[in-house]
Amino acid sequence: MRLGKDGKVELIKRVPLFSKLSKKGLEEVAHIADELDLPKGKVMAVEGDRGREFFVLLEGEADVTKGDRSINTMKEGDFFGEIALVTKMPRTASVTATTPVRVLVITERDFGALIKHSDEVGRGVAEALAERIAPELPV
């Protein structure tokens, strides 16, 4: 069953990158999020590649690997790629569907256009990123 706008908003607001957004900002992000059905075995992220999309797992499971070692199993509600979407840093792990999956996807292009169009989304994402990296900065 496909998510409606409210379902997308509920998932997106759990993502730390979007935690500072108002309901309107969350709705703007939900508007650019696409639902995709992907087959078992589909590689959604490759370690070392530059991330160009952000994923929320809606149904199914995916294996997270670093090198040839499995480090985690992702399930419904888990997400990945949000930092790569903004920072353009390489992926730190690979993610492969171990069952057929349904995902919510936000592409770099759509997200970039939204940030240019929406001051609130741009500010909210910048604030959330600053809070995330501040503890790692030397004092």
Regions found by a protein language model. Name each.
Residues 1-139:
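Cytosolic regulatory regions built on CNB/CRP/Popeye-like sensor folds
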